[in-house]
């Protein structure tokens, strides 16, 4: 999957290290990220040549082996060799470890950008010098990176799996039922609620499969398998806010793997097709 970058080693522990010229410098602008014309992430030296202030005000994010990633709050203008493009391009970047490192760096850079001012008192915030955190110098409130829990569910009816297709957005391939965990819910509660809300089914024998960090939505996704409990007829949500355009049962023999396996969704679908055992936990 996307985060499987071995033999490279991902280091997300905080460090106060300073940038060097060949380190990677992440510059984000909303859902876009600054890239070289060759679709590689720019170095500190390359950004410095365009905007020296951006390089001087860079701060450390993470490392993969000896490749260090930094970001800056300073907006860098586009040039003939540097331009902003959708962060989703990192999903298919080669080598894959750079795509993963770049996307997690974009996630952190976006979080820093959203917390430039204290949400409690409005004072300009500061970076902690002891941990990855943002501190308000006036009221003392501390902010930590946001991670939103998500569940994704492979709903099974014997030799069939339920595939869905989103009603909106750019992703047009089949997917699985998924959604954010609400306050006060267990992961298992979220599984039952999302399945009922989106496809009108009851499920049983909920069993954990695996998880995946997904930087593009600042999420940690927990994947579950669950069996249909009762009538398998799909009833898509029609309250005017329906997320799904389609929900269809597909047999194991008919199942075609549409994705490269970068996402948890298609890793779970592959496991179903190949009959991987998933133990019951709830």
Summary of predicted features, one role per range:
Residues 22-24, 151, 222:
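Residue-level detector of short, conserved catalytic/binding motifs and their immediate flanks
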Residues 1-96, 277-282:
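N-terminal alpha-helical interaction blocks
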Residues 32-36, 67-73, 160-165, 176, ...:
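Short, well-ordered strand-loop elements centered on a beta-strand within folded domains, enriched
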């Amino acid at each position: 999957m996307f985060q499987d970058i071995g033999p490279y080693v991902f280091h997300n522990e905080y460090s106060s290290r300073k940038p060097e010229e060949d380190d990677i410098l992440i510059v984000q602008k909303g859902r876009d990220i600054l890239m070289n014309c060759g679709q590689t992430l720019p170095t500190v030296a390359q950004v410095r040549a365009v905007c020296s202030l951006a390089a001087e005000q860079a701060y450390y994010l993470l490392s993969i082996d000896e490749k260090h990633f930094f970001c800056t709050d300073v907006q860098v203008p586009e040039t003939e060799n540097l331009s902003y493009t959708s962060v989703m391009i990192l999903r298919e970047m080669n080598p894959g470890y750079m795509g993963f490192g770049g996307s997690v760096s974009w996630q952190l850079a976006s979080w820093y950008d959203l917390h430039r001012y204290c949400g409690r008192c409005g004072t300009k915030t500061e970076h902690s010098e002891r941990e990855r955190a943002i501190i308000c110098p006036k009221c003392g409130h501390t902010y930590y990176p946001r991670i939103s829990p998500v569940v994704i569910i492979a709903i099974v009816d014997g030799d069939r799996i339920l595939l869905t297709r989103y009603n909106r957005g750019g992703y047009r391939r089949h997917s699985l039922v998924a959604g954010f965990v609400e306050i006060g819910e267990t992961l298992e509660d979220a599984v039952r609620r999302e399945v009922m809300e989106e496809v009108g089914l009851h499920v049983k024998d909920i069993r954990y499969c695996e998880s995946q960090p997904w930087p593009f939505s600042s999420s940690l996704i927990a994947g579950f398998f669950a069996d249909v409990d009762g009538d398998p007829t799909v009833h898509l949500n029609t309250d005017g806010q329906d997320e799904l355009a389609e929900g269809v049962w597909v047999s194991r023999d008919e199942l075609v793997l549409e994705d490269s396996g970068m996402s948890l969704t298609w890793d779970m679908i592959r496991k179903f097709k190949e009959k991987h055992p998933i133990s019951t936990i709830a």
